[in-house]
Structures are given as structure tokens and as C-alpha cells.
Amino acid sequence: SAANALQLPFADNTFDKVMCSEVLEHIPDYQGALKEIERVLKPGGLFCASVPRHWPEKICWFFSEAYHQVEGGHLRIFKAGELKQQIETLGFHAFHQHWAHALHSPFWWLKCIFWKTQNSNWVIKQYHRFLVWDLMDKPVFTRTLEKILNPIMGKSVVLYFRKEAN
């Protein structure tokens, strides 16, 4: 079953850790969702949020209007610094940030360039097979390549916070 991100079915200060991965860009009232996360997280608890990184996402929006107009799709593009500030105003302290999924950026750019034929496009299908292979087998070469490319073109930014103790 699904929960409403603006009314989580949990008591205040329930969790030691909360993770919100690739969700906030889909929620109309993402600030309300962040307030709910703050509410259910214990003082001193850890919060991890990941969202699509600004510039790789901008490229997707540039190549395809349909990409961000699908039902339940991305409603906004976050800038990491601005999102971090918004979360800190809720009583969190940011302590780490990194980028992830660099090998996924070209896949999404291709999908956006060839939006109307993405399901039948040979190049996109092969790239998808490559990503699945990479995720399942975790070869040293692609893991190393992604570590090198993540700071440059990681598809996602991952932010880590600690909720202030009372």
C-alpha cells in the first residue's frame, strides 16, 4: 500500500534513520514532505535525501518536454545547495554530499533525445542491458569509471543530514 508523504502513518520521533531517494522531485508539496520527515525522525537521527542533479536533469528537460510532463514525473529540478539550505532550516545539519549514477546520465539523455521511439530504439536497449549488467555484476572497470565520472556527471546528488537534538 502507499502512504501519503504529507501525512506519514507514524508517531513523532519514531525513526533513527530516514531515506528519501529520488522522491522529492515528484511531490507537488515537497516542503511538506520534508516537514513530515523531520517529524518522524528522532532527534539526532540521520536523514539521507537523493534527487536528480541539476545539470544532467536540465539536459533531459531540454531534449524532451514529455520527460517532465508524464503523470507522476519530475515536477522540478533542484539545485543541491538550495535544497540543502531548505532542509537545514527544518533543524538539520548537513554533513556529507556526493554524486551517484554517472553511467545513468547518458542513458536518460538518449531516452529523452529519442523519446517517441525509446521503447524500440536499439541503442537505448543496448545501453539498458549494459546498465543491468553493471548493476548485477559490478565489474571493477565500470565501478572505477563511475567513481571517476560521478563528480562530473553523476545523475543524482545525495545529501546526508543529522537532525538536531532537542
Q: What are the roles of these predicted feature ranges?
A:
Residues 5, 72-73, 78, 154-156:
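A conserved catalytic-core signature of glycosyltransferases
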Residues 62, 99-166:
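A C-terminal cap/extension of S-adenosyl-L-methionine-dependent methyltransferases
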Residues 1-60, 80-84, 159-163:
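Conserved SAM-binding loop
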Residues 5, 23, 73, 93-96:
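Short, flexible active-site loop motifs that bind/organize anionic cofactors or intermediates
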Residues 31, 45, 67, 91-95:
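Secondary-structure boundary/capping signal
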